Amino acid sequence: MADLVSVERLSKNYGPVKAVDDVSFGIQEGICFGLLGPNGAGKTTTIEMMEGIVTPDAGRVLFRGTPIGRDFKQKVGIQFQTTALPEFITVRETIELFSAFYPSPRKFDEVVALCSLEDILERDNRKLSGGQRQRMLLALAVLPRPEMVFLDEPTTGLDPQARRNFWDLIGRIKAERATILLTTHYMDEAQLLCDRVAIMDHGKILEIDSPQALLAKHFEGALIRLPYDGCCQDSLKDFKGMLIGDDFLELQTTGLDASLRDLIEAKIDLQGLSIHKPDLEDLFIKLTGSSLRT
């Protein structure tokens, strides 16, 4: 299947800082594609170049095989990290206002139901909670029935229940076969919603594939994780597959009982030990040695 969007060797510098460094990837139509990485990885600059907001120093973005131009903006919906809503008007009035900007917007009742706005239609924009505000911004992004929706860290700062409610809304957008580009710091979010993910750090793509394929490629068995204060470094050298972070130890093992015995015999303090199945955050730590939320 041909890619809906193709990113070809994008680069962007800000003075001496190489924010995006020769990045290439494709996004197939109808999938949710996750662009993951810590703050400063280059993902926001990448997404802004894809949206046509920032001009790349090198490379190009293709939409259906054609370089993006003015008409591209009519085919996408964007939910930015931060957006100022009109003050002193209600949610209902805001939807009606933005609907007037498009030749063929969704029907009012349709977008209200899609984004679960029924209970806040008469509320002033200034009085919206974080979760309500994000639902509202998503509604504005999907008003023109875009072929592609950009969601730049849409659940940052939301409480756990509001995040889960927003996931349901993204699921509804996916069900319409819209193509979604999602940036997020939350790995449970990416693992649940994304069909494919690209992991970025220092302006480069480290890995790209489905979450399941990436985890199968990099991990077998379980992960043992322990707090670490810098002691017993000589003992740790004997452990194959041991990752030593700033404040943690992580050991990948296919023989859990034997690994626990080895840790005890090495006189490693097991207080705070946890054992779990690897996830995307573990993969990022393995690739870069840093946490996704730093």
Residue ranges and their predicted role:
Residues E220-T294:
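Short, charged/small-residue-rich alpha-helical element at the C-terminal edge
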